[in-house]
């Protein structure tokens, strides 16, 4: 699917140009970020991988998202893109509370969960690599404990996260998180689209308002310009 979705078109159509292509599970401003080459848009390669996996004619799946306008816009783009590779995507939009119940708080192993595809976003609110990876891809974070909705399990990656938390050596931590990011990029349990630009508007006479990566607003040092 990484090859079947045009990330440049996604940024232009869905994000109005206000994003950059993802090169890691982490955003570029996150501590210990290590970028990789984005997966290129290559429809023929996508079809070949599908055929090699036993789906020469594609398959049908359901993509779950919330009912927000932005989520639906993203899912409709994904639906159109994957159709060109032979994948039929049915969009199932739900209220956030229902999504939380059926997806994020699902009980039991991944094989028993009624989720085929799910569209979501994540950023490290702490600015640290661990919180950008562990909640969404560590084995210990499978629902209902946290948000590993892809039910990705990789002992080597989990080991990197564990070792990085056990050392205060920043050079060693950087190496471990770099390795974890490489594993994720190669295994690609998730299709990573883009890093949104944080954009906001304020009156010309307001200064020192800050926006955190998770969208939080910091007005602690806000002031009015004379």
PLM regions with names:
Residues 31-45, 49, 53-55, 105-111, ...:
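Short, solvent-exposed loop/beta-turn-alpha elements that line the ligand-binding surface or hinge
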